[in-house]
């Protein structure tokens, strides 16, 4: 935004302050002299649009932020048909907090790391799936990537796995499908091949250190933005769904689907309902499993 000629900025936010970054986005837009639009997403709106998202996605996608992105696309399309988005910066320049553990993981990466949102262990999948296939393993998908990256440092391996699996298989899919459904064209300047070439040649020490992630990127941003914005701690594209889905006002549809005939074709319904009950009972870590199912 700071480097572009865009005159308008759009952002999604929530009433729950600890999940909301839209006020900081508004401050940044005001600082840059841009018109700012804020879309406040309610739990009712979130769950209501899920069928629309799944229909237009044309395949299952267990990414809770895809729903938020769809709402954002629809809101943005009300006043423009072309916009910029910042996808790619985290994967190219070391933006994810887990990248700080890269050196500690070392050579063990290839045995377990298949991306930044691995939801379930294989024994958990085996318990809930009626037709579990032990020959279809996520780590096998990542194996060729690790072969290509042989000899590179651990951070480079992690980021390349995320580029080829997460960025391509989730983020690009989400941007493409949801923008098209809303009649919006999204351009992602940070995924330009020239940007990737710079990032791929950059030593990892300029991407992540013990105190900071996305070091070089933030340092460059500080030339056009105040340091408190450029170096602000990353929250991520988070959704308050872990709170919403535990609320009986919003989770009745989830309960019905977990007991449906369709669910019974693929899952042990008692097993998945046990996961759901455990989540509602206070184990908030299970929310990703519930949403993915």
Kindly label every feature range from the protein language model.
Residues 1-10, 83-92, 187, 221:
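A phosphate-binding catalytic loop at a beta-strand-loop-alpha-helix junction
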Residues 10-16, 36-40, 62, 205, ...:
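Acyl-group handling in specialized metabolite and lipid biosynthesis
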Residues 15-56, 131-146:
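A conserved beta-strand->alpha-helix junction
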Residues 58-65:
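Short, flexible loop segments at the rims of nucleotide/cofactor-binding pockets, characterized by
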């Amino acid at each position: 935004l700071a480097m572009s000629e865009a005159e308008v900025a759009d952002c999604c936010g929530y009433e729950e302050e600890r999940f909301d970054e839209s006020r900081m986005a508004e401050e940044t837009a005001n600082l840059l002299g841009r018109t700012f639009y804020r879309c406040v997403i309610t739990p009712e709106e979130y769950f209501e649009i899920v069928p629309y998202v799944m229909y237009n996605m044309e395949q299952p996608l267990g990414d809770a932020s895809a729903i938020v992105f769809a709402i954002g696309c629809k809101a943005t399309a009300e006043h423009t048909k072309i916009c910029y988005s910042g996808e790619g910066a985290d994967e190219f320049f070391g933006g994810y907090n887990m990248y700080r553990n890269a050196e500690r993981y070392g050579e063990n990466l290839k045995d377990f790391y298949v991306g930044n949102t691995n939801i379930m262990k294989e024994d958990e999948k085996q318990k809930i799936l009626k037709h579990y296939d032990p020959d279809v393993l996520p780590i096998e998908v990542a194996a060729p990537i690790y072969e290509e990256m042989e000899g590179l440092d651990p951070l480079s391996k992690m980021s390349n796995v995320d580029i080829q699996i997460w960025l391509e298989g989730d983020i690009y899919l989400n941007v493409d499908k949801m923008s098209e459904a809303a009649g919006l064209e999204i351009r992602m300047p940070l995924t330009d091949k020239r940007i990737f070439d710079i990032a791929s040649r950059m030593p990892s020490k300029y991407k992540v250190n013990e105190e900071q992630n996305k070091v070089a990127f933030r340092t460059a941003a500080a030339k056009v933005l105040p340091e408190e914005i450029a170096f602000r701690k990353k929250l991520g594209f988070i959704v308050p769904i872990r709170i919403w889905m535990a609320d009986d006002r919003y989770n009745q549809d989830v309960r019905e689907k977990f007991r449906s005939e369709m669910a019974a074709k693929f899952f042990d319904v008692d097993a998945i309902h046990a996961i759901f009950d455990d989540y509602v009972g206070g184990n908030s870590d299970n929310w990703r499993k519930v949403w993915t199912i």
